[in-house]
């Protein structure tokens, strides 16, 4: 990554750099957690990750703390997306009662009645039409209920919305929360000043979504492992017949360009040497393991084979910094999860600093049972991808610098 961008974000002031005593604090958290149809939360990681900043403000005697978050993509007010569904879990994890405010006006009333150190959760901020438009009126309203604005929602830091950007124009003090700081420090450790050799593991289904990342990262890394359906397009660029495998035909020449550029910059790219293939993803009665160039007619590659697994594990072992973005096979189907899981075990066995991009990658690491053995797992999917692409995230641009 171009050092300037990440260094600029690394110099953001955090809540530890200011005094919150007797001040009204508004924290933009990310409580956008997955739930089942009965509104039971299946993974509360995002709530847990927000606790250190909330507790820091309580311990340092903030007058009151307003928590602001979105949940899903509601179109207007919709009970299905109410943050009431997460209130009990937040109370349990925080170990205290939390007042619930249906509206911003309601927050003001609660602030006047509340005792010092009380916590208020505002209803889903996306119920306000102006939120995603970064509307000035909503931004000023939010700023009016706080003396200090803290952004701790890394997962939405690539979005220029009222609660992540607009509010900062009107709030008296604007700083990063402890999670936001931890995220940017981890990315800086992996990209701005990494221990070498640096390895990028990149997967997922689309080359198109990882193009900017690949071009940007060639200046940072020493080697790249490309897996998942993405690797099919690169294997085709090397002249292999990929049969029925998912290939982005319009990007084969782009893949060739990346391979050439990597060679020019002396970055070694590793692709699968053998693959697991099937003629039917749903039924998968017929499964074959063949060299990558010998996929049987009518079959599609769905995972890396054992020789690739061994090769990739050796590459991992010889790395000091590992950045991983995107799973390397259809890990949700047990029969095709071995490649991704084996690699997760290999990464956990190293002493390297491992930075895991959010979203599907974090989910795959979870399913492999290796969450606790990674150095840092990002809470943001889209946000972490944009950082790897070398972008400055909008939410960081509006916060105060040291």
From Swiss-Prot:
Alphabetical UniProt keywords: ATP-binding, Cytoplasm, Glycolysis, Kinase, Nucleotide-binding, Transferase
Subcellular location, principal: cytoplasm
Pfam family, one: PGK
Pathway annotation from the record: Carbohydrate degradation; glycolysis; pyruvate from D-glyceraldehyde 3-phosphate: step 2/5
Disulfide pairings: none
The EC number(s) this enzyme carries: 2.7.2.3
Domain of life of the native organism: Bacteria
Family stated for the protein in its record: Belongs to the phosphoglycerate kinase family.
Name assigned to this protein: Phosphoglycerate kinase
Species for this entry: Helicobacter hepaticus (strain ATCC 51449 / 3B1)
């Amino acid at each position: 990554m171009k050092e300037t961008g990440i260094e600029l974000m690394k110099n953001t002031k955090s809540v530890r750099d200011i005094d919150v005593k007797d001040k009204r604090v508004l924290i933009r958290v990310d409580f956008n957690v997955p739930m089942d149809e009965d509104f039971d939360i299946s993974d509360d990681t995002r709530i847990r990750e927000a606790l250190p900043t909330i507790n820091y403000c309580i311990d340092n005697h903030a007058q009151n703390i307003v928590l602001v978050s979105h949940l899903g993509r509601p179109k207007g007010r919709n009970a299905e997306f109410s943050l009431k569904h997460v209130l009990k879990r937040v109370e349990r994890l925080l170990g205290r009662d939390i007042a619930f405010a249906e509206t911003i006006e309601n927050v003001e009333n609660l602030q006047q009645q509340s005792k010092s150190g009380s916590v208020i959760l505002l209803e889903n901020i996306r119920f306000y039409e102006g939120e995603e438009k970064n509307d000035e009126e909503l931004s000023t309203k939010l700023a009016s209920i706080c003396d200090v604005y803290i952004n701790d929602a890394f997962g939405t830091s690539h979005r220029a919305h009222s609660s992540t950007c607009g509010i900062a124009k009107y709030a008296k003090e604007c700083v990063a929360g402890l999670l936001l700081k931890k995220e940017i420090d981890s990315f800086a450790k992996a990209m701005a000043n990494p221990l070498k050799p640096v390895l990028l593991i990149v997967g997922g289904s689309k080359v198109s979504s990882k193009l900017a990342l690949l071009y940007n990262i060639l200046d940072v890394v020493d080697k790249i492992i490309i897996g998942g359906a993405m690797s099919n397009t690169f294997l085709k660029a090397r002249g292999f017949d990929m049969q029925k495998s998912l290939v982005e035909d319009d990007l084969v020449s782009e893949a060739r360009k990346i391979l050439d550029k990597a060679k020019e910059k002396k970055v070694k790219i590793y692709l699968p040497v053998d693959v697991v293939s099937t003629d039917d993803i749903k039924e998968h009665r017929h499964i074959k393991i063949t060299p990558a160039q010998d996929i049987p007619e009518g079959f599609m590659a769905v995972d890396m084979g054992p020789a690739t697994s061994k090769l990739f594990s050796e590459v991992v072992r010889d790395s000091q910094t590992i950045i991983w973005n995107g799973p390397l096979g259809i890990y949700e189907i047990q029969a095709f999860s071995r490649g991704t899981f084996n690699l997760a075990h290999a990464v956990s066995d190293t002493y390297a600093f491992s930075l895991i991009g959010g979203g599907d990658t974090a989910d795959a690491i979870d399913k492999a049972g290796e969450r606790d053995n990674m150095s840092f797992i990002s809470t943001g999917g889209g946000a972490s991808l944009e950082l790897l692409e070398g972008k400055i995230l909008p939410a960081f641009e509006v916060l105060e610098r040291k």
